[in-house]
Amino acid sequence: MKVGIIGAMQQEVAILKEAMTNAQTVNKAGCTFYSGQINGVEVVLLQSGIGKVAAAIGTTILLDEYQPDMVLNTGSAGGFDSSLNLGDVVISTEVRHHDADVTAFGYEMGQMAGQPAAFLADEKLMNLAEKALEQMDGQHAVRGLICTGDAFVCTAERQAFIRQHFPSVIAVEMEASAIAQTCHQFKVPFVVVRAISDVADKESPMSFEEFLPLAAKSSSEMVFKMLELLK
């Protein structure tokens, strides 16, 4: 069994990379691939770069050349669910693009031509994430829709647009839908497990940059627990 793990930024993959043994590094097309083992599980850790195009390029190479049995997307996200606070975890049930609009041709908002409106996370991987969560004392998590776009959502106007068109959204970020769409086309199961680095409509004394290392720690701990359960 081989697990693909994807994070966009160096900060989001650093803790996982440090835990790897027998690691080999390959740089290709602006992406960095670390192959080795974590806690006895064979993994390929991808640092894709930020945004949907970078994520799609990296995921395509990951699936085509390394052929993992599953994909875990880790890192940070912006919270939209009112119960979420900094450091909480979100687990995807489905993923959608929030910045795609071909509704003029009869598609749903967020749906790309020829693609499903939503990319459904794998049920077994969602349950695995829930089991991992049970082993993390006091870690709060919400399970639901995660939306992706090539923008850091920080204006009231964009937040309102997303809430209007995707009322069940729990979090937003910048890579997951590209990863999910690529996994869908390769028929590889995926789940998104991220930690909240900022929350819409909630003031925080910490900025995104300040909280990112803590979000990376929370999401990495979830991945570690999931890998332990896979052994």
Curated annotation (Swiss-Prot):
Pathway this chain belongs to: Amino-acid biosynthesis; L-methionine biosynthesis via salvage pathway; S-methyl-5-thio-alpha-D-ribose 1-phosphate from S-methyl-5'-thioadenosine (hydrolase route): step 1/2
EC numbers, comma separated: 3.2.2.9
Keyword entries, A-Z: Amino-acid biosynthesis, Hydrolase, Methionine biosynthesis
Reactions this protein catalyses: S-adenosyl-L-homocysteine + H2O = S-(5-deoxy-D-ribos-5-yl)-L-homocysteine + adenine; S-methyl-5'-thioadenosine + H2O = 5-(methylsulfanyl)-D-ribose + adenine; 5'-deoxyadenosine + H2O = 5-deoxy-D-ribose + adenine
Residues reported in the UniProt entry to bind substrate: G78, V153, M174, E175
One of the GO BP terms on file: L-methionine salvage from methylthioadenosine
NCBIfam families, alphabetized: MTA_SAH-Nsdase (TIGR01704), PRK05584.1 (NF004079)
Role: Catalyzes the irreversible cleavage of the glycosidic bond in both 5'-methylthioadenosine (MTA) and S-adenosylhomocysteine (SAH/AdoHcy) to adenine and the corresponding thioribose, 5'-methylthioribose and S-ribosylhomocysteine, respectively. Also cleaves 5'-deoxyadenosine, a toxic by-product of radical S-adenosylmethionine (SAM) enzymes, into 5-deoxyribose and adenine.
Record's protein name: 5'-methylthioadenosine/S-adenosylhomocysteine nucleosidase
Organism: Vibrio vulnificus (strain YJ016)
